[in-house]
Curated annotation (Swiss-Prot):
<protein>
    <recommendedName>
        <fullName>Inositol-pentakisphosphate 2-kinase</fullName>
        <ecNumber>2.7.1.158</ecNumber>
    </recommendedName>
</protein>
<comment type="function">
    <text>Phosphorylates Ins(1,3,4,5,6)P5 at position 2 to form Ins(1,2,3,4,5,6)P6 (InsP6 or phytate). InsP6 is involved in many processes such as mRNA export, non-homologous end-joining, endocytosis, ion channel regulation. It also protects cells from TNF-alpha-induced apoptosis.</text>
</comment>
<keyword id="KW-0067">ATP-binding</keyword>
<keyword id="KW-0547">Nucleotide-binding</keyword>
<comment type="similarity">
    <text>Belongs to the IPK1 type 2 family.</text>
</comment>
<dbReference type="GO" id="GO:1901838">
    <property type="term" value="P:positive regulation of transcription of nucleolar large rRNA by RNA polymerase I"/>
</dbReference>
<dbReference type="Pfam" id="PF06090">
    <property type="entry name" value="Ins_P5_2-kin"/>
</dbReference>
<dbReference type="GO" id="GO:0060090">
    <property type="term" value="F:molecular adaptor activity"/>
</dbReference>
<keyword id="KW-0808">Transferase</keyword>
<keyword id="KW-0418">Kinase</keyword>
<feature type="short sequence motif" description="EXKPK motif">
    <location>
        <begin position="136"/>
        <end position="140"/>
    </location>
</feature>
<keyword id="KW-0539">Nucleus</keyword>
<dbReference type="GO" id="GO:0035299">
    <property type="term" value="F:inositol-1,3,4,5,6-pentakisphosphate 2-kinase activity"/>
</dbReference>
<dbReference type="InterPro" id="IPR043001">
    <property type="entry name" value="IP5_2-K_N_lobe"/>
</dbReference>
<dbReference type="GO" id="GO:0005730">
    <property type="term" value="C:nucleolus"/>
</dbReference>
<keyword id="KW-0963">Cytoplasm</keyword>
<dbReference type="GO" id="GO:0005524">
    <property type="term" value="F:ATP binding"/>
</dbReference>
Amino acid sequence: MEEGKMDENEWSYHGEGNKSLVVAHAQRCVVLRFLKFPPNKKKTSEEILQHLQNIVDFGKNVMKDFLGENYVHCGEVVQLPLEFVKQLCLKIQCERPESRCDKDLDTFSGYAMCLPNLTRLQTFHFAEHRPILCVEIKPKCGFIPFSNDVTHEMKHKVCRYCMHQHLKVATGKWKKISKYCPLDLYSGNKQRMHFALRSLLQETQNNLRIFKNGELIYGCGDARSPVADLKELAHHLKPFFFPSNGLASGPHCTKAVIRELVHVITRVLLSSSEKARAGALRLGLQGPRVCEASPFSRSLHNQGKNTSEHSGLPKGCLLYKTLQVQMLDQLDIEGLYPLYKRVEQYLEEFPEERKTLQIDGPYDEVFYQKLLDLSTEDDGTVAFALTKVQQYRVAMTAKDCSIMIALSPCLQGTSSDQRPVIPSSRSRLAFSVSVLDLDLKPYESIPHQYKLDSKIVNYYSKTVHAKDDTVRSTRFKEHEDCTLVLHKV
């Protein structure tokens, strides 16, 4: 960043989460990411600098090795003029969602992270004139717990995402339950993946967003009907997939365009990057490969068809690598929580050891190497407990990451430069795949995760599963009074 040339009018609001806010540059393919804090919990400039540097180091030394360097963009910490930051904050305030304004942008330290704009293709530093489409997917956890420490039998049958949906709707977080199940997307089976992606398009919640030329055009809003939204989305997407304009408008056009989008995303998700590293983890999928709550699986089950269709993911693709990192959670939160308590007890006795244990960093090669110890035999030591706690934090990070797929039509008669290309029915699309939201989950969040897990499972068991049992019981009772009488002929 060139300090003397910072103009807030060249930057626009891009989005925000619980802990940070992002602005994008109008011409250059870069974004600035600022930390956010509650008004009464300000941090010093030194603490903010260390926090941001830890994020960069974790991406560079841990996630790049696990996921592959082509997929992970670490960025760098930059120091900005305070006047620029304050003016920028004033400029974007009116664009922020009201629900996010409980925290303030850090305008005191001047530190931020400079990252590539992942809604653009990642082989260009400046915005291209050709149209660029970007699909952001938050796939969530792609496996069912296989740990023997799990006490709720339901957790061995239904995935966390599907169970959590019911609690979120009950508490008003979402209006309706999504048909999306992460296990369908991670199955590698194209039919299941297509169903999962269509389900995300019908009920995006905060798991899918679509950008066109860096501007959000779909997702993160439930005020309008999905049908109206999909019709408008198809209008935006038509030039990407049917450039000759051979399709008329109407419901058939909408279906054709959405079908093409789903097929292209599936192909991209199953593609491998030749330059990406193979990945250091070799964890086999041990739990069930089908979630009993998935509408796709239920439909097949009701038709008497095999529900265990699981083609498997290609080992070089990003979904496979993400799933491998997620499976560092070998013990589930139920098995992990007692180990967390062991570490906590040790820190109460020896608080000065917190730095030695690398709980707050540094996230270096030493930290990374300890994550590769996949032993599950507890020897009763703090070292074993700490390794499992750190693996759990990394796994939770992978369970909450986002995948960004950028697509752009290949111009006729031109080479694809360095970019891989995916064919669609009527066009060829250059693409890049990236992953973001890779901040290491905080050590302090483990007790919250333990309580939330219990809350999710208990609610699902008492309401949804109990209702299913009642329905099955009623069906049985309808027939139990029937008597077959045989008469001699």
